[in-house]
Design a protein with these regions (language model features):
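Primary recognition of N-terminal secretory signal peptides and signal-anchoring hydrophobic helices
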Residues: 6, 24-32, 254-361
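Solvent-exposed coil/turn segments that connect beta secondary-structure elements
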Residues: 92-94, 101-103, 113-115, 129-131, ...
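Structured segments of extracytoplasmic/periplasmic soluble domains
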Residues: 99, 129-132, 188, 192-196, ...
Length: 361
């Protein structure tokens, strides 16, 4: 058959089809590029369609399979969402923390094993996950299906052997040593945890009565928990040693530390804030410290960094330089001045910037 003008209808339809596919290909690639800016390889495979270009040449550039393969390659180079997650269970604090990298993103109270049937320490991993588990009584083989009467609650996270993290039908046990070795959680908490993990992530079970951390506002805080398993004796020197890693051991009063050890109530004990210290734009290896509304500077090390000679009089508790004299505070092995004395003693003025760094000029 022919249309007017003598061009075969079938041939014309094939040419129009090729042109339509080409235009669709170009617009389709542009739309994909807008949504996925890193998927930019497809356009290099697209040829300009002419009457001489066969449909067979154009078709591979517009297949969904090719675009999906490109996206798949892109995704393979990205870290999976769960790759750097891990669970840490501290039996002393009776807390379970879910970490993303080094950042704790969720924390829940738990009920670990009784002293007579303690939860074992060590590294494990999530081996299986089950919704609506059935509990089997180890003594009678009686089966209790998931529900309000089931000791496992509605979620089971197996961590090897007969041990697991699960819900409970005895909510009052949370915060105590109550189980036969498993880790009980409040039902809402275990369901939340269940939704944010996958099989295979590590589970670290530790026993640490002393926990030290630094808050986002730079405050170093320590917590002392009871020795529920009778495994870890602590004294003031143990606390000081841990605090020294943050540079704040000198700011922890020994009497206050002793009181915290005696109470062992898990309440926060605030020591000092630790600020990175900059001198005329250069970051120093020393730090500024905030405590009780004051900022303290390690004066001898700071004076050396500024090229200023400073002398400490231990009897008078005073620091002197060519510029002036100021009171000093001896904490541990370092001498500090109040930052408000820096202009007089060192001809330097300072402030906290928005990143909570202390800058001196």
């Amino acid at each position: 058959m022919k249309e007017k003008g003598g061009i075969p209808l079938l041939k014309r339809m094939m040419i129009m089809l090729a042109l339509g596919v080409a235009l669709g290909t170009l617009s389709g690639v542009e739309a994909k590029s807008a949504a996925h800016p890193k998927v930019l390889l497809a356009p290099t495979k697209v040829e300009t369609i002419t009457q001489e270009t066969s449909v067979a040449q154009a078709t591979p550039a517009v297949t969904n399979t090719e675009v999906k393969e490109e996206v798949k390659k892109e995704n393979e180079t990205q870290k999976p969402a769960f790759e750097d997650k891990r669970i840490e269970i501290n039996l002393a604090s009776k807390l379970l923390t879910l970490y993303q990298g080094d950042v704790g993103i969720r924390m829940y109270p738990i009920a670990p094993g009784k002293p007579s049937s303690p939860t074992p320490l060590g590294r494990r991993k999530v081996e299986d996950m089950e919704i609506n588990p059935t509990w089997i009584d180890p003594d009678s083989d009686t089966k209790i299906p998931s529900g309000p009467d089931c000791p496992l609650g509605y979620r089971w996270i197996g961590i090897g052997g007969n041990y697991g993290i699960h819900g409970t039908n005895v909510a009052s046990s949370i915060g105590t040593y109550a189980s036969h070795g498993c880790v009980r959680m409040n039902e809402a908490d275990v369901e939340d945890l269940f939704a944010h993990i996958v099989k295979g992530i590590p589970v670290d079970i530790i026993y640490e009565r002393l926990v030290v951390e630094q808050a986002p506002d730079k405050t170093v805080i320590y917590y002392v928990y009871p020795d529920g398993y009778g495994r870890e004796n602590l004294d003031v020197s143990d606390v000081k040693k841990r605090l020294s890693a943050f540079g704040v051991a000198g700011f922890a009063d020994p009497d206050e530390v002793q009181h915290a050890l005696a109470m062992a109530d898990g309440d926060p004990n605030y020591v000092a804030k630790v600020y990175d210290l900059y001198l005329k734009g250069e970051k120093l290896k020393i730090h500024a410290y905030g405590k009780d509304g004051h900022i303290y500077l390690p004066v001898m090390a700071l004076a050396r960094a500024a090229g200023i000679q400073a002398e400490w009089s231990p009897n008078w508790k005073r620091i002197s330089t060519a510029y002036g004299v100021a009171n000093g505070l001896e904490l541990g092995s370092a001498i500090y001045i109040d930052a408000t004395d820096a202009p007089v003693l060192l001809h330097l003025t300072g402030h906290l910037n928005e990143k909570l760094d202390y800058e001196l000029q």
